[in-house]
Swiss-Prot record:
This is Adenylate kinase. Pfam families: ADK (PF00406). The gene is adk. Its main location: cytoplasm. It comes from Streptococcus pneumoniae serotype 4 (strain ATCC BAA-334 / TIGR4). GO terms for cellular component: cytoplasm. It is found in: Cytoplasm.
């Protein structure tokens, strides 16, 4: 089975990816792992990626696409299939992936799209607060401290609502054309992500069992 998993930050994509890999024994291909492996093994694309990262520069699309192609060319993929997680991030990368899969003779069989309302993601992602003295982490809504006094807690810049909203807006703008691209191919399976983790996986499991 050859799959993509998509969803906004905080939608539970990583959790569900781990469950899919465990249940269906496909190779989990996450962007971060792929980059680390390519650099550690000093592949042609890995060496190139490292040269950009060492200079603090963004890795260009063609290098990222090359690293994905290197990974998808490996023997285990033919045996197990794959779950791509964190790629493609742009419509240009989606077109590059189409080309790579065609060249390798691999067919993409499904795109799992975990849908969660952006407003509830904003609440989920921007609620984290940290105690100034103890460093303990709490959540304003889901795990509030018993003796909450606003002055005793702070938020990291990354967790502030305006920062989170910007991040979500960017992800929505980049993700929508990708979903539309795969929807036109009849590959997208929308999964309601605003429910218990196990219920989300149960819905995914039904979809994937029918694909097998």
């Amino acid at each position: 089975m050859n799959l993509l998993i998509m969803g906004l930050p905080g939608a539970g994509k990583g959790t569900q990816a781990a469950k899919i890999v465990e249940q269906f024994h496909v190779a989990h291909i996450s962007t971060g792992d792929m980059f680390r492996a390519a650099m550690a093994n000093q592949t042609e694309m890995g060496v190139l990626a490292k040269s950009y990262i060492d200079k603090g520069e963004l890795v260009p699309d063609e290098v990222t696409n090359g690293i994905v192609k290197e990974r998808l060319s490996q023997d285990d993929i033919k045996e197990t299939g794959f779950l791509l997680d964190g790629y493609p991030r742009t419509i240009e990368q989606a077109h590059a992936l189409d080309k790579t899969l065609a060249e390798l003779g691999i067919e993409l069989e499904g795109v799992i799209n975990i849908e969660v309302n952006p407003d509830s993601l904003l609440e989920r992602l921007s609620g984290r607060i940290i105690h100034r003295v103890t460093g303990e982490t709490f959540h304003k809504v889901f795990n509030p401290p018993v003796d909450y006094k606003e002055e005793d807690y702070y938020q990291r810049e990354d967790d502030k609502p305006e920062t989170v909203k910007r991040r979500l807006d960017v992800n929505i703008a980049q993700g929508e054309p990708i979903i539309a691209h795969y929807r036109a191919k009849g590959l997208v399976h929308d999964i309601e992500g605003n429910q218990d983790i196990n219920d989300v996986f149960s819905d995914i499991e039904k979809v994937l069992t029918n694909l097998k």
